[in-house]
Amino acid sequence: MNKLPHETRVVIGMSGGVDSSVAALLLKEQGYDVIGIFMKNWDDTDENGVCTATEDYNDVIEVCNQIGIPYYAVNFEKQYWDKVFTYFLDEYRAGRTPNPDVMCNKEIKFKAFLEHAMALGADYVATGHYARVAYMDGEYKMLRGVDDNKDQTYFLNQLGQEQLSKTMFPLGELKKPQIREMAKEAGLATATKKDSTGICFIGERNFKDFLSNYLPAQPGVMQTLSGEVKGKHDGLMYYTIGQRHGLGIGGNGDPWFVVGKNLKENILYVDQGFHNELLYGDEVIATNVNWVSDRAKEKEFKCTAKFRYRQEDNGVTVQIVDENTIRILCDEPIRAITPGQAVVFYDGDECLGGATIDEVYRSGEQLDYLG
C-alpha cells in the first residue's frame, strides 16, 4: 500500500548548489518528510587554505533552515578515495580518460549514500539530477530530463532497478531557468550561486598541477604516425583524443590534434585537421556493461548512443559479446571516441544503460589510441 507523502521519508543529497536546494524545496512543498544530507567526499582545502566544502555546507544549513527541514553532514571520504579517486588515477596511469562523475554516482550517491539514507529510515533518496524515473510495464525506467541542455542520464548510466525503485528526481520535469526562478521566489540563499563545473575534487585548480601531485609525469616525444617529430609532450596522462589546445605546434595550415597514444613507447601521436580520418571510429568494444532493465537483452539490437556528455545521439547496433562486454557498430563514423569514457544507450527518451569504452576501430583496424 502506498504511503501518503507526510508518511514518506525522503533523504535528499544536498551539495550547496541551487539544483539540490530547489529539489529539497519541492519535496517539502509536496508534503514529504524531508531530511537534507551534505556529502563530504573530498578534503578540498584550496591553495589559500579555504575549505570550499565548509562554504557549501554553510549554504546547505542556510537553505535547510529556510525551508524548515533537518540536515546532517556525512563523511564519505574513505569510500570516495577507495572507489572513485583510486579508479581515476588508475585510468590516467593506463593512458585513458576516466569519467569520475559516473563512478561517483555508482559508488557514492547511489550506493554509500543510499545505504546511509535507508539506515535513517528513508523510503526514498533524492538528488538534484536532471533525469526522470517512471514505472512502466512492470519495471522502472530512467528517462531523460525534459531540459535537453541539462539532462544528466549520461552520468547515471550505471543505475539499475534496485536504485531506481528508491530514487526521486524532483527536477526531471523542469528546465534550469525555472529552477533559478523558483529559488529566487523562495528567497533561497543559493538562488544566484553559480553552478559548479569540472571535476569536483579538482575545483578551480590547474588540472596538470593537480594530477602531478599524485602521478609522476613522464615527458616524451610528440610525433606523427609516420614518425615526424613535432615536439615534446608533458606526459600522456595530460592529453585526450581529439585535443587541440596545449600542443604548442606552430606553423601554417590546419590545426593539430591528438590522434593517439603509445603507452609502451611514451609517444603522443598528432596530426592535422579537425576531420582527420585518424580521429574517426566506427566500431567500439566496451566493458563494465550495465543495463537499467533486468530483462534479458536481444543478442543484437539497434538504439542510439552518446560517446560523451552533450553529444548528439548517434545511431548504433549493439552486439552482446558476453555479460560484461559489448561490440558497438556505428551507423556513421564518430569523431574522437575516447577509451575510458562512458558510452550510454537510449531508446527515445529512455536511458537503457551504459558501458566503458575500451577499444576503438575504423574499418576493422584498431585505432592507435593505446598501443
From Swiss-Prot:
Which GO molecular function terms does the record list?
ATP binding; tRNA binding; tRNA-uridine 2-sulfurtransferase activity
Q: Where in the cell is it found?
A: Cytoplasm
Q: What is its main location?
A: cytoplasm
Keyword Iron-sulfur assigned to the entry: answer is no
- Residue sites binding ATP per the record: G13, M14, S15, G16, G17, V18, D19, S20, M39, G128
The UniProt entry, under InterPro entries, shows:
MnmA-like, MnmA-like_C, MnmA-like_central, MnmA-like_central_sf, Rossmann-like_a/b/a_fold
EC number, as in UniProt: 2.8.1.13
Annotated stretches, region: Interaction with target base in tRNA: 99-101
Q: Where is this region: Interaction with tRNA?
A: 150-152, 308-309
One GO process term, biological-process aspect = tRNA wobble position uridine thiolation
Swiss-Prot/TrEMBL keywords: ATP-binding, Cytoplasm, Disulfide bond, Nucleotide-binding, RNA-binding, Transferase, tRNA processing, tRNA-binding
Which catalytic residues are annotated? C104 (nucleophile), C200 (cysteine persulfide intermediate)
User: Which residues does this entry assign to the site Interaction with tRNA?
Assistant: H129, Q341
Positions of disulphide bridges: C104-C200
**What does the record give as the function of this protein?**
Catalyzes the 2-thiolation of uridine at the wobble position (U34) of tRNA, leading to the formation of s(2)U34.
> What family does the Swiss-Prot or TrEMBL record give for this protein?
Belongs to the MnmA/TRMU family.
For this entry, the protein name equals tRNA-specific 2-thiouridylase MnmA
Give the species: Bacillus cytotoxicus (strain DSM 22905 / CIP 110041 / 391-98 / NVH 391-98)
Q: Gene symbol? A: mnmA
